[in-house]
């Protein structure tokens, strides 16, 4: 029977970052960790010989070429992590991306594969950040109702067995056309559960994959974004009254109109 400890695979660009990340985890949770392994991030190089690979990824028509290359690199890096799990035949596998930041005490390995963090969005992913998802998850494992919501981002994925990792690896290789990895996992409904509250968030920084702002992905993944405000309708702005002073915004003497100066 496998030891009930984590085998952690950290995707990052160099060994120095890996050593720092793994050291922090070991310092606090040595009793819960069996092994940590570095998975080098994949920085793909576009040449005249391989530019056809850009057509393999299904994206919006206006997606920048640089972003497509990064998303393909993300898929390639996760394939390497899955292959490492298969090669090592490890259980209780936690795949972390470089920006995964531990938010709560590391729990004991869950009994099933799950998201250990992410962003909960509507079933139509294009409505993410626009339509609010109203759910009240309990502490621990929660079932994903794909008719009501999906989870995107791939910074912390928990895969229970090497067999499951092998199955997922096969799924990422077979398609003629690929999707961004998080969209692919959501559309395939690969993970059936998520752990709440989020064990890992994306730390505040500019994402190397999607160029999002420094804090945006942090708030999206903090408790799965359930407490994050969604975009509302545009507020109507009051028009200035005619004849109002542009310098001091003062009202005309004797005017009964309310001051409409923007504050």
Predicted region positions:
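An acidic/histidine-cluster motif and surrounding catalytic segment
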Residues: 2-96, 100-239, 262
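Small-residue-biased low-complexity repeat regions
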Residues: 232, 239, 243-244, 248-249, ...
């Amino acid at each position: 029977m496998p030891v009930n400890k984590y085998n952690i695979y950290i995707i990052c660009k160099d060994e120095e970052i890996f050593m720092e990340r793994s050291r922090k985890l070991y310092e606090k949770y040595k009793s819960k960790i069996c092994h940590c392994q570095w998975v080098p991030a994949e920085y793909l190089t576009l040449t005249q010989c391989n530019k056809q690979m850009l057509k393999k990824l299904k994206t919006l028509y206006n997606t920048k070429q640089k972003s497509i290359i990064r998303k393909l690199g993300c898929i390639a890096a996760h394939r390497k992590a899955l292959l490492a799990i298969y090669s090592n035949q490890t259980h209780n596998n936690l795949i972390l991306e470089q920006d995964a930041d531990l938010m709560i005490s590391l729990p004991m390995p869950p009994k099933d594969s799950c998201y250990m963090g992410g962003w909960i969005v509507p079933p139509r992913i294009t409505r993410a950040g626009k339509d609010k998802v109203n759910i009240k998850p309990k502490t621990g494992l929660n079932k994903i109702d794909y008719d009501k919501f999906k989870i995107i981002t791939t910074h912390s994925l928990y895969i229970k067995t090497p067999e499951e990792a092998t199955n997922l690896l096969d799924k990422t290789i077979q398609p003629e056309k690929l999707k961004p990895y998080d969209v692919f996992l959501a559309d395939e409904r690969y993970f059936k559960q998520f752990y709440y509250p989020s064990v890992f968030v994306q730390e505040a920084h500019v994402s190397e994959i999607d160029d999002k702002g420094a804090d945006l992905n942090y708030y999206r993944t903090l408790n799965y974004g359930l407490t994050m405000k969604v975009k509302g309708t545009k507020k109507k702005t009051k028009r200035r009254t005619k004849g109002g002073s542009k310098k001091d915004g003062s009202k005309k003497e004797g005017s009964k109109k309310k001051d409409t100066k923007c504050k």
